[in-house]
UniProtKB/Swiss-Prot annotation, chains A, B:
Positions of the catalytic residues: 140
Protein name: Glyceraldehyde-3-phosphate dehydrogenase
GO molecular function list: 4-hydroxy-tetrahydrodipicolinate reductase; glyceraldehyde-3-phosphate dehydrogenase (NAD+) (phosphorylating) activity; glyceraldehyde-3-phosphate dehydrogenase (NADP+) (phosphorylating) activity; NAD binding; NADP binding
Catalytic reaction annotation: D-glyceraldehyde 3-phosphate + phosphate + NADP(+) = (2R)-3-phospho-glyceroyl phosphate + NADPH + H(+); D-glyceraldehyde 3-phosphate + phosphate + NAD(+) = (2R)-3-phospho-glyceroyl phosphate + NADH + H(+)
InterPro entries, per the entry: DapB_N, GlycerAld/Erythrose_P_DH, GlycerAld_3-P_DH_AS, GlycerAld_3-P_DH_cat, GlycerAld_3-P_DH_NAD(P)-bd, Glyceraldehyde-3-P_DH_2_arc, NAD(P)-bd_dom_sf
Organism: Pyrobaculum neutrophilum (strain DSM 2338 / JCM 9278 / NBRC 100436 / V24Sta) (Thermoproteus neutrophilus)
Gene behind this protein: gap
Pathway info: Carbohydrate degradation; glycolysis; pyruvate from D-glyceraldehyde 3-phosphate: step 1/5
A Pfam match: DapB_N
Residues annotated as binding NAD(+): 11-12, 110, 169, 302
Keyword entries, A-Z: Cytoplasm, Glycolysis, NAD, NADP, Oxidoreductase
Record's GO cellular component terms: cytoplasm
Length: 344, 344
């Protein structure tokens, strides 16, 4: 059993913790919280040992939570640390704590690529995290793009260049202070947005440019993709590629999937934890070929898409399972769509 | 003085009416309203003769508005009719009324292209409406795209193909029943959206594909454009083209234009009627060249962008002014941005 310490039990960390619990080859060593808020109490109720920073111990005690120890105690109790701290805090934690212990650490996409030795996506480069000390699971949008592009190339559809146009959700559901409201915000106004270069930390040779705007939505990101292929391919070959690629879901308008909200409604109806949808939701009706051009729209659930990637990153680091067996195990344990999927 | 009858005094019609009032070569013959609501009362307070449909006369009287006559009386009192009815109602009006009178009619972009002999954009094909009986001013998004592409070609920047990705405003500010709220809706899920073919009703040979999603915004549409040019051009040449093209405004992030809402705030600060912004608002920072590729983002104010186009369409039909003199006269009378603009 791999003992996993989760540093940062927020939007991503709490989901990874629950995903770890669903595995039979790993378990939670503990989770680190900075504030003794309702999320900390949820961690306690889940039975997770709750650690905190040295200067927060008294605060936790006052709030009725007895900390299991400090961050360094958590690192010592873990075989691997998953850092899901807010942007840039992961790097601070590395300098302050992780460098002093000989434990592998997985960072999230909020950190710059050079925080780690390798940027990770299970479909694209599972093997590259093997034995690494520092691994970074790329961010939600980058994960979505990487899955779509890798699905194509794994299935014989060659890519000449990808131009992706992103309508980003402005905030997560719980972020009550973030906007926009009734506005569309270039994010950034310059081209490219960071997503293109970020994809290239994994798919090093892909010709990709991305543009992004933020919109008043908390539910999911939406991508409009224009991809030039290396020749003309039948649309059915592209659809078939998506249909058999794990962690891609084909949403049909005819089946009621007319928008991102309907994808999340489906997740809620399925009883998925927190109404999460870790698959890339490709709108099947949008998949269009036009000579050697491919168009498609897809949704990316920013809160959950990286969760299965973190689970696979753990197995990849320790080399306990090969790529496809890990992906399949993760998907089954998290009850992702497995019907028609080809694992290997 | 050209006497202009406005059929449909809603979002577009009321703006065209005010724009007509600002001209010294045309005047309002009257406006047609179907409901005696607050907009009808605004029309009365503006001093416009208010006409209605035959079966609505009593309703208007009960509401305290004495109609000046019926739609046929309005047609008779006009030299030209601008039909700004809801989608498809323009065509019904044509079949029911306009065909029986020998007066030119201008339709809006909500109607299909074949309602008219020519689709119109002042920059692109001003001369083609000359002497026509039925003219159609294309819709807001189509007008925005047509201006941007025409600005490039008029200034020596050749276009190979245009791929435009649109985050549409979900509703106008007054449309209280329309959505989405907290959702991104493929609009449509199929590719292309109608905008590409609609641009081709004016720029017949342009290779264009468009995709669109609707977002929870009432303020403006946002376009992300990817344009392949016929060779590499310096970015400055593109910026210069936009800078001197009438009805295109370059919004600098450094000057505070960080989003669409800031563009509208500027219009409000300028004291523009209804806070309108009929110019295409190009985010200067987004204009990027990359080999022969051009990227940019721009906002399109759906409520007002077609207003100056309708004024020019009237002059074009009657041949009272050549293209650039009409555009300049319209822009000055409506107090659009004229600094640095080249009219001719």
């Amino acid at each position: 059993m791999i003992r996993v310490g989760i540093v940062g039990y927020g939007t991503i960390g709490k989901r990874i913790a629950d995903a770890v619990v669903a595995q039979d080859d790993m378990k939670i060593a503990g989770v680190l919280k900075v504030s003794p808020d309702y999320e900390a109490k949820v961690a306690v109720s889940r039975g997770f040992p709750v650690y905190t920073l040295p200067d927060r111990v008294e605060k936790f005690k006052k709030a009725g939570i007895e900390p299991a120890g400090t961050i360094e105690d958590l690192i010592k109790a873990s075989d691997v640390v998953v850092d899901a701290s807010p942007e840039d805090v992961g790097r601070e934690n590395k300098e302050k704590y992780y460098q002093r212990y000989d434990k592998p650490v997985i960072f999230q996409g909020g950190e710059e690529a050079d925080v780690a030795e390798v940027s990770f996506n299970a479909l694209a480069n599972y093997e590259e995290a093997r034995g690494k000390r520092y691994v970074r699971v790329v961010s939600c949008n980058t994960t979505g793009i990487t899955r779509v592009l890798t699905s194509l190339t794994l299935n014989g559809v060659g890519i000449k260049k990808a131009r992706i146009f992103i309508a980003r959700r402005g905030a997560d559901p719980k972020e009550h202070k973030k906007g926009p409201i009734n506005d569309v915000v270039p994010n950034p106004a310059t081209v490219p947005s960071h997503h293109g270069p970020d994809v290239q930390t994994i798919l090093r040779n892909v010709d990709i440019v991305t543009m992004a705007v933020a919109v008043p939505v908390t539910i999911m990101h939406m991508h409009m993709a224009y991809i030039e292929l290396d020749s003309a391919y039948p649309k059915d070959q592209v659809i078939e590629a998506f249909a058999k690629t794990p962690r891609i879901f084909l949403a049909d308008v005819g089946a009621g999937f007319q928008s991102l909200a309907q994808v999340i409604e489906y997740a809620r109806d399925l009883g998925r934890p927190r109404g999460d949808f870790p698959e890339v939701a490709v709108f099947r009706d949008s998949v269009t070929t036009h000579g050697n051009e491919l168009y498609l729209m897809y949704g990316v659930h920013q809160e959950s898409i990286v969760v299965p990637e973190n689970i696979d990153a753990i197995r990849s680091i320790f080399g306990t399972l090969p790529k496809w067996r890990s992906i399949e195990k993760t998907d089954k344990s998290l009850k992702l769509t497995t019907e028609g999927k080809r694992y290997g």
